[in-house]
Amino acid sequence: MFGAMLRYLIGISFFADSRFPWATLTINLLGSFLLAWLTSYVFKKVRLSPHLSTAIGTGFVGSFTTFSTLSVETISLFQDGHNFLAMVYVLVSLLGGLTMSHLGFKVSKEVQKS
């Protein structure tokens, strides 16, 4: 619930007037990094109960990011005739999400070394 509320606040605070779904893209990329970093570093370093780790990872980060919004916004871009933007959005979301997850894991490894 808190993740979804934060997603909404970021969307209306920073990206309300944009035709391109910058809010969802930014949030999904940040969430990809955050979930990878949490699971590969924080949850190993800080002793949390499995229930609390799941609540933070799946609950907060899962509700912060959203695949359904990505899907709906992509279809809307196609329906509005913005085919190129729709394709760019999907590609950047997918490749960017994978890249940010990779960076999250990489940062956690570097932090663990030091």
Curated annotation (Swiss-Prot):
Na(+) is not transported, but it plays an essential structural role and its presence is essential for fluoride channel function. Na(+) binds at G62, T65. The chain crosses the membrane at residues 23-43, 52-72, 84-104. GO terms for cellular component: plasma membrane. One of its GO terms (molecular function) is fluoride channel activity. Keywords: Cell membrane, Ion channel, Ion transport, Membrane, Metal-binding, Sodium, Transmembrane, Transmembrane helix, Transport. Belongs to the fluoride channel Fluc/FEX (TC 1.A.43) family. Fluoride-specific ion channel. Important for reducing fluoride concentration in the cell, thus reducing its toxicity. This is Fluoride-specific ion channel FluC 1.
